[in-house]
Structure formats: C-alpha cells, structure tokens
Amino acid sequence: MNLTKVWNTTLGSLQVQLPRHEYNTWVRGATLLEIDNGVAIVRAPNAFIKEGLESRYLATLREQLGSVVGFPVDVRVVLASPDFERFDGAPHNGRSTENETRRTAQSLPLQPGSSSNGVNHPLERTPPQQLELHRAVRSSMLNPRYTFDRFIIGPSNRLANAACMAVAEHPAQAYNPLFLYGGVGLGKTHLLHAIGNFVLDRDPEVNVLYVSSETFTNDLINSIRRQQTEEFRIRYRNIDILLIDDIQFIAGKEQTQEEFFHTFNTLHSAGKQIVISSDRSPKAILTLEERLRSRFEWGLIVDVQMPDLETRTAILRAKAEQSPVPVPQPVIDFLAQRIQSHIRELEGCLNRVTAFAQMYNVPVTIEVATAALSELLDTNRRKRVTPDAILREVAAFYSVDLRALQGRSRSRNIVIPRQVAMYLLREETDSSLMEIGQLLGGRDHTTVMYGCEKITEELNSDARLRQEVATIRERLLHSAG
C-alpha cells in the first residue's frame, strides 16, 4: 500500500469537505505514518494539533481513510518526533520547519521590548516561554507558498491584487486600512499571506502578524482568564502590520469588538498597516459596531469575486504544473467547466484526481477525473439549470431554430448542436436517456447514448468544441444564478 497516495487522496477529500480555515489549521500539517492491523497512525506536528484532531476530527479521518483504502480503519494520532522523517509526497509548505519557525516567530513579539516609545525591537525568547511561542507561531503563521507570484490574476481579483501589492510595497501609505471581502475560497487569505511574505522578504525585521479573528477572540478570552490582558495588548499592538482574516466572526462579540477597536486605533494612529478580510462588506456585517464599521471604511474596500472560466483554467494549469503526474489540458478544461465555485474546491478536486490516478496507476483522463470526483459531481451538478434552459441556450449559441433542434432534421448544422444538447442534458440535469430523447424529437435512448459518447470523446481532442461547451455552460450558470 502506497501511504503517500492514500494520504494525498484523503487530504483531497478533506480539503473539499472542510471549511478552509479548519483544513489549514487542523489537517494540512498532519501526516500518515502507517496503517497496520486496521489502525492508521497519523502524526500531528504539535500537541495543539494533536488535541484538535482527537477531539474534533477522528470520526472524519476514519471515514475518509476507510473510504480510500477500502476497509474500516481506526485512527490513532501521535505527536511529531525527531525520530521520524516526513514521508515523500506529504503536504508541506516548501521550507524546513526550522526556517519556517524562525520566520514566523520573528514576526511576532512575545515580550515587551526595552523601549516604551512604540519602536519595535527584536525580543528575546526564553525556554520557559516555549508553549507560548508555539501558540504565537500558530497565530502568526505565514504560508510561504502564498506569494504574489503564485496568485493567478483575472478580472475577478485584479483590483484586490493591485491594492495588496501597493500595501506591501508601501505599508500604511497606500490604503490603510485595506478591507477585502468576498466568498470563501476566492484568494483573500492568499493575498493576506502574500503581503506578509513580501514585506518580510524585503525586511525580516518588520513585525508582521497574521491572525484570524477567531484566534484574536480566543487569545483575548485566555488573557482575561489568566489575568494577562496587558501581555495580550503588547502582543497585538507592538507590531508593524496586522493581517486579520475573517473579521466577520467578531460581530456580536461585544468585548472582542471593544478590544479590537482599541487595537485598531493604536495601530492606525501609530502609522501601522492594517489589512482585513471578510466574507461580506462592512455594511453587510449586521451586528458589527458602527464605530468599527466606520473605521473599516476609512481606507479602501475591495470586492473579490468568483473566478471566471479563464481564471479557473489558469489556476488549475498552475496547480497541475506542480502535480506528480501529467494532467492533460482537456482534463484541466473539464474541471474548470464543472467546478464553478471557489479556488479551494478547484485545487482540492485536482489533488483528488491526481491522487486517484496514482493509486490506480492510470493516466489522468476525463473518465478518470469523473470517477475520482463522482460523489462531488453527483452532489453539485444537475441542480442549476432546467432542460428547457439548456435547449434554449444551445439553440441560441449555434443560431439554430429551437423547433429544428427538437425536430427530425439530420443536417450537420443541426446534428452537432443536438448532440451537444444531449450531452449537456445528460451532464447537467437528472433527465434519463429516454426523457432526453423525448425532448429531442422522440429519439430512442441508444441514439441519445451515442450522441453523448460522441461529444465526450471529441471533447478530449477538439479544443474548439471544448470552448463552445464551456461557453454554453458559463451562460447557463449565469442565467441560473
């Protein structure tokens, strides 16, 4: 059994299934060490992750691993040890743990410096603070893979990328605060990390803190419980750049909003940069205090939108270049057409497809992709459009009469659009072959099956047809949305 392939397939499923912040926080850094006598040994990078996996995700891990290996497994989580090496193919962030810890630790002061005038100095860390350091590293972690160079730019995110680059090049001079908002998995977190990585690459002495609003809230609660609120304020206010993710979660939390209000004021008045992300605009966060809302609107507010087909294709192509197995362009086009949501799901699906192909030692094809993603596609497809909408859109795209499309004509200018309609009706609706045949002039199910198979085969080799089908799908999605 190839543990690398098993774990990569499991991670692909979990990346699609779990919210982004949960996957990145709890699952991404874990590794599979062995499966023996029905027990899977999963290694956690630290005690915090180990506790979280055991308390929250054991059932999910059992289910997903069992689904991949084909038999029930129990899961035991162990703590990382120097005696073990990360196995080949495990997800990693491209840098050694030592370098990563150095980089992230230096971005967050843990103790007050010798100066009280707001100037940041490197702060000394002592062994008794080791547990505190681990917690700080987690909350300030910058993923070195998330850089501007690796961010795929399209019409949906061009302004957001430009604004973040301006902030990274001239902190607290361009837009302060910068507020990014948009749905999950659209690249907001990538851009926040990219700002931090860009700044630290230019000047490692800059104090950069990336943190989620949930972590901010938990740190505040813990500091109150331990009577360490002053240490909390030093930690969050003695920095140069604050990158705070998912700010919408502080809405309705009165004490958290109070503390963040004063943190914001302290940083802003000291000329420090603040970058905020949210799943909605400040005005749409209903239980957000007005004084915070008004401050969020001081700078620039940028909407990050859903990626279009061209951007989805570019994202998948860039991801495929890092794949251990070749991913042909027809498969990239297929995934870009079928996964019409967010970037996280796109990447998770590609990971699952390539791991599936590795596990069964087969090349990546559209058929393999369909098999690997069968559960996801069955869940997501057939729910956006109606058969009538498909017929109308196909007729309009090919400039043919709808009655001719549904009639008995066998002329070539009708046959190809009709076969495309058969294919889309089969792929995008719950219609049976017989029902599709009735919609298209009373044809029998074997004729419909032939038409669907013919289009499926030609999509592998005909770039023009792929583009035509993709365009029709885009129009259907927009009209249904």
Swiss-Prot record:
Positions with biased composition (Basic and acidic residues): 87-103
InterPro entries: AAA+_ATPase (IPR003593), Chromosome_initiator_DnaA (IPR001957), Chromosome_initiator_DnaA-like (IPR020591), Chromosome_initiator_DnaA_CS (IPR018312), DnaA_C (IPR013159), DnaA_dom (IPR013317), DnaA_N_dom (IPR024633), DnaA_N_sf (IPR038454)
Record region (Disordered): 87-128
Region span, Domain IV, binds dsDNA: 358-481
GO BP terms, alphabetized: DNA replication initiation; regulation of DNA replication
The organism's place on the tree of life at top rank: Bacteria
Chain coiled-coil ranges: none
Keyword Cytoplasm: yes
Signal peptide range: none
Region (Domain III, AAA+ region): 141-357
GO molecular function, one term: DNA replication origin binding
Binding of ATP, residues: 185, 187-189
Ranges where the record places region Domain I, interacts with DnaA modulators: 1-71
Biased composition (Polar residues): 104-119
GO cellular component, one term: cytoplasm
PANTHER family with a match to the protein in the record: CHROMOSOMAL REPLICATION INITIATOR PROTEIN DNAA
Protein family: Belongs to the DnaA family.
Domain description: Domain I is involved in oligomerization and binding regulators, domain II is flexibile and of varying length in different bacteria, domain III forms the AAA+ region, while domain IV binds dsDNA.
This protein's name: Chromosomal replication initiator protein DnaA
Originating organism: Roseiflexus sp. (strain RS-1)
Taxonomy of the source species: Bacteria, Bacillati, Chloroflexota, Chloroflexia, Chloroflexales
